């Protein structure tokens, strides 16, 4: 059970740092809302630990600090699954969730792997690569939410992953300019090249034009397809959980609608939704959930998962979760450690041979 003080700290962290999820979570039943706040708080801590790991804005030094932040998160996750969490509210709360719900370790490890990809500065040549990244930093959270609702049906898990993918594609579309000014690009490189926009040109001078608008539009169309398909899985969730998940779907899709209203300009403008809009979507979500038992079934419930999320579906559907580190995470962490050792050797060499 999550300690009340830890839950209060997690709730405050989400209230001030994740407005969209905080709004949607208000429609979840308390038995799901409490562990979901712990889950999102731990994910937020992990994300912030890497995003905020900077060293005076120097690109090379920042990358080193980010690598060390990921390695520290690895150790924190080990402590969580060892039943000895770090003495911090989010860690203690998430450890309680892991124990109560038998959370498959592969799911939070997937998030950590995605953060490790950020730390090594990975970019993505194709849309499939973007989905690989989105699977780790967002669809994994969708799968974990299903576990908190005690739903492990593979079809429902696949649709939850669709929703996570769609949300992350929306985030990428919203943050095109912010990311570019930080030297990062999450858009598919081949889509940019098809529009005649070299990635290096855009990173050197992030300006809005028809080329970047077209890529952003295309990404949001892909998100819309996934949002629509994700709806088929909502009816596989407990009735009391459906309003909150519909709300998450509508609130995040609404960000994409705002980007469209801005002419697909995410370089000079940042899309946001108002409190009034969120209230409207919360009302719509409650209505849709109330009517959901009387609606027809949807054939897309049984659609195969996107190949990039199949490993998440398989992990979450297992009756007995694996507790050891996955091979994928071991590989990317080894890469981070090797880079760290190389930098240390270079520094020792520089001190031994001063100019």
UniProtKB/Swiss-Prot annotation:
Pathway: Carotenoid biosynthesis; phytoene biosynthesis. Its EC number is 2.5.1.-. One of its GO terms (molecular function) is metal ion binding. One of its GO terms (biological process) is carotenoid biosynthetic process. Keywords: Carotenoid biosynthesis, Magnesium, Manganese, Metal-binding, Transferase. NCBIfam families: PhytnSynCrtBRhod. This is Phytoene synthase. The gene is crtB.
């Amino acid at each position: 059970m999550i300690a009340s003080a830890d839950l209060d700290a997690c709730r405050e962290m989400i209230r001030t740092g994740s407005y969209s999820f905080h709004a949607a979570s208000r429609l979840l039943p308390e038995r799901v809302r409490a562990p979901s706040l712990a889950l999102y708080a731990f994910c937020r801590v992990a994300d912030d630990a890497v995003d905020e790991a900077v060293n005076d804005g120097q690109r090379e030094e920042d990358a080193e600090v980010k690598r060390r932040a990921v390695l520290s998160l690895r150790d924190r996750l080990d402590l969580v699954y060892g039943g000895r969490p770090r003495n911090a509210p989010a860690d203690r709360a998430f450890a309680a969730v892991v124990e109560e719900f038998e959370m498959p370790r592969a799911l939070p490890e997937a998030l950590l792997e995605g953060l490790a990809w950020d730390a090594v500065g990975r970019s993505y040549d194709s849309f499939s690569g973007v989905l690989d990244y989105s699977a780790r930093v967002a669809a994994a959270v969708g799968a974990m939410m299903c576990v908190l609702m005690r739903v492990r049906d593979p079809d429902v898990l696949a649709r939850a992953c669709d929703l996570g993918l769609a949300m992350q594609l929306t985030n990428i579309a919203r943050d095109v300019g912010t990311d570019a000014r930080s030297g990062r690009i999450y858009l598919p490189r081949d889509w940019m090249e098809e529009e005649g926009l070299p990635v290096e040109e855009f990173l050197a001078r992030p300006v809005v034009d028809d080329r970047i608008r077209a890529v952003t539009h295309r990404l949001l169309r892909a998100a819309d397809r996934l949002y629509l398909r994700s709806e088929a899985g909502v009816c596989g969730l407990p009735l009391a959980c459906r309003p909150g998940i519909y709300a998450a779907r509508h609130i995040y899709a609404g960000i994409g609608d705002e980007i469209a209203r801005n002419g697909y300009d995410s370089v000079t403008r940042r899309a946001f939704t108002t409190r009034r809009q969120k209230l409207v979507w919360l009302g719509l979500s409650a209505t849709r959930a109330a009517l959901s038992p009387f609606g027809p079934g949807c054939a897309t419930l049984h659609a195969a998962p996107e190949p990039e999320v199949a490993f998440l579906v398989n992990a979450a559907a297992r009756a007995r979760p694996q507790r050891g580190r996955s091979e994928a995470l071991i590989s990317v962490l080894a890469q981070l450690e090797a880079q760290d050792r190389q930098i240390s050797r270079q520094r020792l060499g520089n001190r031994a041979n001063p100019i």
